């Protein structure tokens, strides 16, 4: 029997300030807490079909090789993005065209409160992949 990858199931970020990062992803990006496992210092958050796990802990000495994390958003409204991130003191880069799972579409980049680079990507101009 063979298998194929359908999509990324979840991403895990190690964070120093777990409550602060939960607040950021809830208030700035609209994630909802789905499950909390206190014994693991883990909060699992959902936005649509995407799952983001935040776990309290220091970043590992080795690794740290993820460039950025991209969330597909709908609709893409730069002004709304800037407005939602401003209370967190986060500035958003210029809107650029980037290729992703659905093709080319508008994207902006910023860093979350712990320095992870985040891309918010809007819909592609066409439905072709």
PLM feature segments, named:
Residues 30-36, 91-96:
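Short secondary-structure junctions
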Residues 32-65, 75, 117-122:
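Conserved short beta-strand elements that form part of the metal-binding/catalytic scaffold
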Residues 5-7, 62-66, 102:
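Short glycine-enriched loop/turn motifs at secondary-structure junctions
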